[in-house]
Amino acid sequence: MVETDQLYHIVHEAVERFAIMEFDGSRNEINHVKVREWLERNYPNKNQKIKQMNPLLLTDGYKTGHHQQYPKGTTLVYSNFTPRSNRYAPKGCDQVVSFGQQMVMQQLHETFERDFFSRPKSEVCGEMKRELSLYLSTDYDTSHFEALHDLGYLPIHVKALPEGSLVPIKVPVLTIYNTHPDFYWVTNYLETILSNLLWKPMTSATIAHQYRKVLTKWMEKTDAERAWFIDWQGHDFSMRGMDSAEAVISSGLAHLTSFSGTDGLPAIYGARKFYGETGFVGGSVNATEHSVMCAGTKDDEIETFRNLMNTYPTGILSIVSDTWDLWKVCTEHIVTLKEEILARDGKVVIRPDSGDPVDIICGKRWNDEQNPYDENVDAIEKGVIELLWDVFGGTINNQGFKVLDSHIGAIYGDSITIERADEICKRLAAKGFASTNVVLGIGSFTYQYNTRDTFGFAMKATYVEIQNQKLSGVSTEGREIFKDPITDDGTKKSATGLLRVETDTDGNYKLFDKVSWAFENSGSLQTIYCNGKFENTTTLTKIRESLKNILTPQLT
């Protein structure tokens, strides 16, 4: 038993708020018996630290009262999660990649199983009573939480569009409704956490797909015989700039729906845990960072290059090359090391890491006449790819574009955007180089500078059922509901009633609202979770294949 003196301030606040007992503020006049009784009821396991957050706290505070606010007799709430707008999305992202529903439902399921249903009811519901009583300044009734614990599972039916498909704006990617009439409140109680977990993987998967679309376009124009290279041309460098380890998994896994290159190891774990992958998921190469180059000293940089090649005599080796003077590396060091690089069984990749990525890779002509007094002007005008060609040469492919010798290459991974990726490929092509001569690192500048509003994701209820008591008996009324704020431009207008999504003659998803249960039960939305059980599971491999097939028409 915790001594009352230790909890004096907590109890004082509780007494003032709840008027649980008469108390005049004098420490010596506390009724210790009543205090101890109250503590036993409201502070179970006081000496234990909470190891995991109670999942019932994973919601907006205002939702904790909504079970009392629905019309009397409510038995069902039906909601959907939908991208409503691409107003703030990168150019070209006119549709959203359906991705992450299976992962999110597994996370939600495991959290409730471990941290709610598997814990004593008195403990988890006692936590909620304590927290919400303090939060709302009332004696909060947790009977609905207790009933959920007694039920032993999440009574919800979740449907989703196939992961790896493209979804038009305003078409729902997920629907959810409760399966037990007593738990109508559960549907939208879960809105907050579902939105929190779903928007990022879908946003990142959509952006990754757009990168692949751009890179595929230029590969087709300049180097179609090396289509395999696209899997590796977009490389995930975002981990250090993401806002959490969880975000690295959700966003990093989203990147892997379109590419195989990644430095985000947690994403590979995510592919195994949430999508059942057992073999190869993603990969990278041996690569240096600035600390390695600095440790070798500026004056001995060329020896650092040589030592690295000796350490890794085979395979791809990426060397960060602008710790001091990128242009010296590209015009002097690699000239000295040329024969060693060509004799090596593998590719040495030069990695610039600062400046304007388009100009660094493609070159920049900053005046009409070269300044004869600036030895770097010629290098800056040419850019890395042309400088590597000057030293190592290469081949001319069937489409007439230059492809660097297989022993040398380049990667740039700082401040890359979809627009810059497109411009790099465009300018390389204009100079006669294949777009496949460079790998682009995609970082948090791409994957972290987004919010739920990037695609306007929102979860809204569109249908409820109300049970009415009449003299003739009990009847159930289905109400088609919607929101359409008069002060909005139409973005926030929701669908109405039960929903069905199906493909049109062009293979595009189309939404039909105000349908019957019979029509809702079929269509493209597939059940993925119902009453604690998973259905229609998929794999990352299938998702990748689906997204690649979408781009196949470009390859004709």
Where are these regions (language model features)?
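Protein-protein interaction and targeting regions used for scaffolding, dimerization, and localization
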Residues: 1-43
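Secondary-structure transition/turn motif
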Residues: 37-40, 350, 539-540
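Residues that form generic nucleotide/phosphate-binding pockets
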Residues: 38, 107, 111, 131-135, ...
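Gly/Ser/Thr/Ala-enriched C-terminal appendages of enzymes
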Residues: 45-114, 259-260, 264-265, 270, ...
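Buried, small/hydrophobic-residue-enriched core segments of structured protein domains
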Residues: 47-90, 132, 140, 146-155, ...
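Helix N-terminus capping/helix-initiation residues
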Residues: 60, 120-121, 141, 183, ...
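Aromatic- and Gly/Pro-rich amphipathic surface segment
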Residues: 100-139
